[in-house]
């Protein structure tokens, strides 16, 4: 973990990341960017496990590692094409919130909606609480 602070620089030197596939977590987290403890302007960062558990007491820690290392929201914004997968009935409520709620640290994945080339792929179960209007998405202005 001693060189994580240069990961973003090394990725940029190599030409960046063309496509990244990530998943939406049951509570709105992504890539270990958890509610109430994700710095929304972070590049790749390390976070002490106890910080995550204090901010999210319902989490179960099944890891002996004292730190999590992850790409923060600012790092993911540099990916050329970001793809989010949402699957399962158990994610239907959080998926609806992800689409409708304002961007916040309570639901960190909402920041991903700002990505300029963002694709969401959801199965029927995950989309089961969405209306036809929700599924159409925001209107796009045509030139």
What feature does the model see in each segment?
Residues 1-143:
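Conserved phosphate- and dinucleotide-binding cores of soluble alpha/beta proteins
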């Amino acid at each position: 973990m001693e060189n994580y602070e240069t990961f973003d620089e090394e990725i940029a030197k190599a030409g960046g990341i063309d496509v990244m596939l990530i998943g939406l977590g049951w509570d709105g987290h992504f890539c270990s960017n958890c509610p109430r403890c994700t710095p929304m302007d972070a590049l790749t960062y390390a976070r002490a496990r106890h910080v995550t558990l204090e901010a999210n007491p319902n989490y179960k820690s099944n890891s002996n590692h004292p730190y999590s290392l992850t790409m923060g929201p600012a790092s993911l914004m540099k990916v050329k094409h970001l793809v989010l997968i949402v699957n399962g009935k158990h994610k239907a409520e959080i998926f609806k919130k992800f689409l409708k709620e304002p961007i916040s640290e309570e639901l960190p994945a909402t920041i991903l909606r700002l990505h300029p080339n963002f694709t969401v792929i959801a199965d029927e179960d995950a989309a089961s609480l969405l209306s036809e209007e929700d599924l159409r998405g925001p209107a796009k202005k045509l030139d």
